[in-house]
Design a protein with these regions (language model features):
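Acetyl-CoA-dependent GNAT
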Residues: 11-14, 22-77, 83, 88, ...
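Conserved GNAT acetyl-CoA-binding A-motif
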Residues: 108-119
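Conserved active-site alpha-helix within GNAT-family acetyltransferase domains
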Residues: 98, 122-141
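Conserved N-terminal entry element of GNAT/NAT acetyltransferase domains
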Residues: 1-15
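Conserved functional loop/turn residues at catalytic and ligand-binding sites
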Residues: 16, 84-86, 90-91, 95, ...
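Conserved beta-strand-loop-alpha-helix junction that forms the acyl-donor binding cleft
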Residues: 117-127, 144-149
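Conserved acetyl-CoA-binding loop-helix of GNAT-fold acetyltransferases
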Residues: 87, 93-106, 129-133
Length: 149
């Protein structure tokens, strides 16, 4: 993968939330996830928000949070959840996701967080590849059910 040396990653600021919501929310560049709503975007923890930029333009974001005793992994205690990673289409393939993940890994290591989680769709093979390249390993699968009435 080519990497662009002009891509920088910085901590998120309150003024970044509007851009995150615009690009990720309804009507943005990303198909809206029915399990995420606007109120959830407003609760993004700023200490876990990372912004990637290229020549002053917004290239993508990553946000994460710290937690304790996840319900889905009974033996775990302290952990970090990489909640969302988004790279604008025109910046994909240039190492933006890799840089965001590298910064995330440095931040959680500095805080002494021993265990990291990320979840993605089973059809999102690009994300699976990115996470596996970063050292994440699959450990749990979930199934969503639906019923028409």
């Amino acid at each position: 993968m080519a990497t662009d040396p002009g891509v920088t990653v910085r901590p998120g600021r309150i003024e970044d939330l509007a851009e995150v919501a615009r690009l990720y929310g309804p009507g943005g560049e990303t198909p809206w996830d029915p399990f995420i709503d606007a109120a959830r975007l407003e609760r993004i923890p700023l200490d876990g928000l990372l912004i990637a930029e290229k020549d002053g333009s917004y290239a993508g974001f990553l946000y994460w949070f710290e937690g304790r005793k996840p319900w889905f992994d009974k033996g775990a205690d302290q952990y970090a959840q990489l909640e969302e990673l988004h790279v604008r289409p025109e910046f994909q393939g240039w190492g933006v996701a890799q840089r965001l993940i590298e910064r995330f890994l440095r931040e959680v290591a500095a805080r002494g967080i021993p265990l990291l989680y990320v979840a993605t769709d089973e059809t999102n093979t690009a994300a699976q590849h990115i996470y596996q390249e970063a050292g994440f390993q699959p450990f749990l699968r979930t199934i969503h059910y639906r019923k028409y009435t």
